[in-house]
């Protein structure tokens, strides 16, 4: 369930309360100490007490017990499990246990971005360990095959299992949205990652990877459109249930006449579907905005410095924080594109700004040019870039907060737009209070050029802020268009009926007059409230809830994929089929667990 509180300040919280009915449904009990849910079958603690986490553990690990369907049967089963009677459990043979262990290790290798050939190395490590610690158990490794070919096959099997789970859930989606991310790159090829966010009957939201599309093979917008429609058809989804599109703001996505979004919106138009809501500022906001605010190619210059530090200044203690930060993002080996993207982060620029004196001294020591450190205009642009990118970092991090609805995310966007207006006003007044790095540079330049009355031109930076404001206005125009829907969804009891669309006024008036529903609204989170709201009594309001809940409210899943790609760029640059890449990205981004029993059964049947 999704937990957007009903206050003006949206917080991320979830009522982590164990429900007694879960004992029979999922074979778990409330632990004597601490939070979570204790599984009666495997005696493992499910750390979270969200129903979907408890259910996923049950479906992935103990689907065998679904054969006990009657209430009396389930009650008797629970009692026997409480007493420690495991005779009914599906007993795995040694071969099946070895298969399951091999599958689990292959999944772990995929999560860590390790190559197929490293399975053999893991096998050898375990053998050395067991020979020293448990020599009598070395034989268990004989049935675990981690050869490269088997590892590849198992990753594909896990991907197929996860994809089947997604498709089964997709059939029940009341509404869904797509996120189209064309910033994924592997070696020299770009990919379009297509993520789906669907909402079920009980307002339970599912976010997952739908497919990946190789842009080298699908260069035209028409080819991309066909590939996406094929993926939707395979999942059993029609365009009539699509509510929203969130994309990057590249020309391929939002070009006025030839962008993919315009094609998809045209295709989705029908008498029975909602107008598709599109917003393009969520994905890679910090990265893509940096190209608009870097007015003097600052980052290209800094990139040259960092490459020089990595090759000639690696042993210098003053640069260790910078090198450590770089290696934590993408390891010791990094290509130029990864490095450039990393330097476009507010956090990285802030660190480099703090090291600017040390970098200048280093450049002098190796005989490199230091002309930029005496360029007044360049230094001012550098300070301004550091400050504005730090503000973009803040909003980008806020948009990574998941498990809130789009209404909360849009509120954060509006708050940031107010911040931009404040920055614009302060720059016009030559008030650098909100520009700490810029202020430091200006103070230093005033000391250096005491006779110069004009250190910088505020109009230059006002234009940048103004351009950023217009970009945000354009990116989130559709969310403003449905602002009333978002407000109605977030605050149904305080929303004035006269401001609501005519079609919903009768339902809204009836809802606000219902004391029982008001009491539920006060004590439940927003997702639980709408899940319990009668679709027969309030069909239009329930429809609005499905619509809003299906909109992407964060960039978390896309950032998770991008971080996985960046961190494992060297491994993913090896020759891999698109099928294997899709499997790796799905394993890395999904919240679902594979159904291990099904995978073991398929392995035995093959």
From Swiss-Prot:
Keyword presence, Endoplasmic reticulum: yes
InterPro entries hit by this protein: SPIN-DOC_Znf-C2H2 (IPR040647)
Keyword entries, A-Z: Endoplasmic reticulum, Phosphoprotein
Localization terms from the record: Endoplasmic reticulum
UniProt GO MF annotations: identical protein binding
Principal place of residence: endoplasmic reticulum
Recorded superkingdom: Eukaryota
Modified residues (Phosphoserine): 147
GO CC aspect terms: cytoplasm; cytoplasmic side of endoplasmic reticulum membrane; nucleus
Any GO BP annotation: glycogen biosynthetic process
Quaternary organization: Interacts with EPM2A.
Name assigned to this protein: EPM2A-interacting protein 1
């Amino acid at each position: 369930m999704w937990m957007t509180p009903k206050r003006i300040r949206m917080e991320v919280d979830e009522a982590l309360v164990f429900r007694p009915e879960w004992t029979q449904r999922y074979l778990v009990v409330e632990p004597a100490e601490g939070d979570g849910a204790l599984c009666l079958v495997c005696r493992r603690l499910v750390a979270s007490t969200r129903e979907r986490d408890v259910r996923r553990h049950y479906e992935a690990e103990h689907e065998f017990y679904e054969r006990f369907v009657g209430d009396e049967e389930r009650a008797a089963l629970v009692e026997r499990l409480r007493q420690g009677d495991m005779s009914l459990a599906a007993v795995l043979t040694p071969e099946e246990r070895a298969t399951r262990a091999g599958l689990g290790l292959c999944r772990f290798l995929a999560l860590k971005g390790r190559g197929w050939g490293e399975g053999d190395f893991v096998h050898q490590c375990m053998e050395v360990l067991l020979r020293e610690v448990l020599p009598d158990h070395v034989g268990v490794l004989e049935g675990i095959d981690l050869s490269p070919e088997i590892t590849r096959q198992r990753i594909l099997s896990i991907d197929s299992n996860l994809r089947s789970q997604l498709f089964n859930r997709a059939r029940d989606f009341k509404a869904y949205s797509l996120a189209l991310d064309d910033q994924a790159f592997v070696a020299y090829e770009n990919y379009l990652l297509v993520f789906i966010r669907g909402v079920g009957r009980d307002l339970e939201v599912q976010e997952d990877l739908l497919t990946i599309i190789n842009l080298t093979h699908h260069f035209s917008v028409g080819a991309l459109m066909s590939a996406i429609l094929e993926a939707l058809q395979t999942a059993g989804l029609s365009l009539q249930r699509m509510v929203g599109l969130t994309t990057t703001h590249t020309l391929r996505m939002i070009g006025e006449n030839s962008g993919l979004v315009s094609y998809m919106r045209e295709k989705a138009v029908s008498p029975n579907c909602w107008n598709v809501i599109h917003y393009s500022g969520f994905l890679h906001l910090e990265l893509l905005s940096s190209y608009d605010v870097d007015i003097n190619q600052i980052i290209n210059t800094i990139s040259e410095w960092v490459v020089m530090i990595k090759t000639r200044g690696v042993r210098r203690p003053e640069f260790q924080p910078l090198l450590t930060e770089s290696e934590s993002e993408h390891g010791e080996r990094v290509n130029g594109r990864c490095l450039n993207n990393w330097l476009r982060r507010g956090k990285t620029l802030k660190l480099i700004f703090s090291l600017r004196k040390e970098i200048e001294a280093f450049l002098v020591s190796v005989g490199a040019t230091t002309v930029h450190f005496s360029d007044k205009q360049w230094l001012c642009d550098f300070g301004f870039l550091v400050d504005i990118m730090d503000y973009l970092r803040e909003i980008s991090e806020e948009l990574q907060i998941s498990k809130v609805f789009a209404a909360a995310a849009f509120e954060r966007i509006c708050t940031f737009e107010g911040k931009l207006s404040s920055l614009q006003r302060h720059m016009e007044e030559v008030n650098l209070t909100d520009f700490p790095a810029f202020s430091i540079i200006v103070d230093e330049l005033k000391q250096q050029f005491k006779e110069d009355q004009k250190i910088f031109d505020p109009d230059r930076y006002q234009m940048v802020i103004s351009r950023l404001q217009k970009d945000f206005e354009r990116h989130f125009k559709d969310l403003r268009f449905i602002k009333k829907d978002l407000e109605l969804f977030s605050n149904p009891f305080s929303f004035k009926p006269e401001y609501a669309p005519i079609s919903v006024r009768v339902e809204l008036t009836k809802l606000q007059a219902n004391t029982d529903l008001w009491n539920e609204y006060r004590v439940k989170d927003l997702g639980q409230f709408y899940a319990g709201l009668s679709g027969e009594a309030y069909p239009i309001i329930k429809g609005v809830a499905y619509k809003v809940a299906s909109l992407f409210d964060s960039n978390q899943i896309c950032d998770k994929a991008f971080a996985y790609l960046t961190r494992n760029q060297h491994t993913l640059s090896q020759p891999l089929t698109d099928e294997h890449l899709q499997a790796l990205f799905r394993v890395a981004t999904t919240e679902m667990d594979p159904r291990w029993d099904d995978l073991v059964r398929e392995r035995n049947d093959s």
